[in-house]
Amino acid sequence: MIQQESRLKVADNSGAKELLCIRVLGGTRRRYANVGDVIVCSVKSATPGGVVKKGEVVKAVVVRTVSTTRRKDGTYIKFDENAAVIIKDDKQMVGTRIFGPVTRELRDRDFMKIVSLAPEVL
C-alpha cells in the first residue's frame, strides 16, 4: 500500500530514479494506493540529461508493491520494492522501456503499453 510520503523506485527510463508520493488519486478520502492506481509524485532524484528533472510534479502508476495484493483466484503476490512508472495526463508513458516485472492487474486498468513493454508479467 502506497500512501502520502511513501518513496518509490521508478521502473522506466524517463530519467527519474526515486519518487515521493504526494497524493493518491481517486477520491477525497482515499488513503492507500495499490497496484494499478494512479498517484501524484514529486521527483526526488533523477539522472542528468533525462526527460524528467528533479523537483518536477508528475503522475505515476504503481506497478509493484511490498504489501501483498490478493487476486480473484485467491492467490497473493508481493514484491521486494515499491515501484511506479511515470505517465502523462492521457495515461501514456513518458519513458520507452520498463525495468523489472509488472502484474497482470495493469491489463485490467488499461495500461496495455506498460504490460507489453515489461520483460515479465506476473
From Swiss-Prot:
Q: Which domain of life is it from?
A: Bacteria
Mind listing the GO biological process terms from this record?
A: translation
Does the keyword Transcription feature in the UniProt annotation?
A: no
Task: Write one Pfam family the protein is assigned to.
Answer: Ribosomal_L14
Q: Which UniProt keywords apply?
A: Ribonucleoprotein, Ribosomal protein, RNA-binding, rRNA-binding
Q: Which InterPro entries match?
A: Ribosomal_uL14, Ribosomal_uL14_bac-type, Ribosomal_uL14_CS, Ribosomal_uL14_sf
Q: What is a single molecular function from GO for this protein?
A: structural constituent of ribosome
Q: Which GO terms describe its cellular component?
A: cytosolic large ribosomal subunit
What role does it play? Binds to 23S rRNA. Forms part of two intersubunit bridges in the 70S ribosome.
Query: Partners and quaternary state?
Result: Part of the 50S ribosomal subunit. Forms a cluster with proteins L3 and L19. In the 70S ribosome, L14 and L19 interact and together make contacts with the 16S rRNA in bridges B5 and B8.
Family (UniProt) = Belongs to the universal ribosomal protein uL14 family.
- The name on file for this protein is Large ribosomal subunit protein uL14
Protein source organism: Alkaliphilus metalliredigens (strain QYMF)
